[in-house]
Amino acid sequence: MINEIKKDTQDRMEKSLEALKSHISKIRTGRAQPSLLDGIQVEYYGSATPLRQLANVVAEDARTLAVNVFDRSLISAVEKAILTSDLGLNPSSAGATIRVPLPPLTEERRRDLIKIVKGEGEQGKIAIRNVRRDANDQIKALLKDKEISEDEERKAQDEIQKITDGYVKKVDEVLAAKEKELLDF
């Protein structure tokens, strides 16, 4: 039973870490990354469709993304979707390819982005601590139902804490890497 709780805890913490990585990968660093445009929805036959389903996005160089639209009739809709997104990008089309130059980040904008990254990191740590609390509650319930001894409860909580510490450390590493990425460019 305790092993199931530990496995579930680890799985949930891993999902929290992956969610954090996904969130902060969308934060623009000044370096062209195709994932930057992942959140963009294009109006396609009356419904919002993810850009990834309508076009191929590649990094042309360090400061330019190339969006190769599969259906030429959608070029203006894709261009409009990129322009109206909150990313502050100014696309230009050349044939079937839309080029999206990334403006350099100002020092002030970098500081703002670092604050956002730290906030996302704190949310990730909170999610991990909530998972720990749930696991500890499950362990206490086992003790209350007399399915485990107090020694087993203490040992299990210590193991859960070690898992938690490991994931909090991973969150810190992800944040440090993103901050370095924001400051280095």
Swiss-Prot record:
Coiled coil: none annotated. CDD domains: RRF. One of its GO terms (biological process) is cytoplasmic translational termination. Gene3D superfamilies: 3.30.1360.40, Ribosome-recycling factor. It comes from the Bacteria. It holds the Pfam family RRF. The keyword Protein biosynthesis applies. InterPro entries: Ribosome_recyc_fac, Ribosome_recyc_fac_dom, RRF_sf. GO terms for cellular component: cytosol. Keywords: Cytoplasm, Protein biosynthesis. Its main location: cytoplasm. It is found in: Cytoplasm. One of its GO terms (molecular function) is ribosomal large subunit binding. Belongs to the RRF family. NCBIfam families: frr (TIGR00496). HAMAP family: RRF (MF_00040). PANTHER family: MITOCHONDRIAL RIBOSOME RECYCLING FACTOR PSEUDO 1, RIBOSOME RECYCLING FACTOR. Responsible for the release of ribosomes from messenger RNA at the termination of protein biosynthesis. May increase the efficiency of translation by recycling ribosomes from one round of translation to another. This is Ribosome-recycling factor. It comes from Actinobacillus pleuropneumoniae serotype 5b (strain L20). The gene is frr.
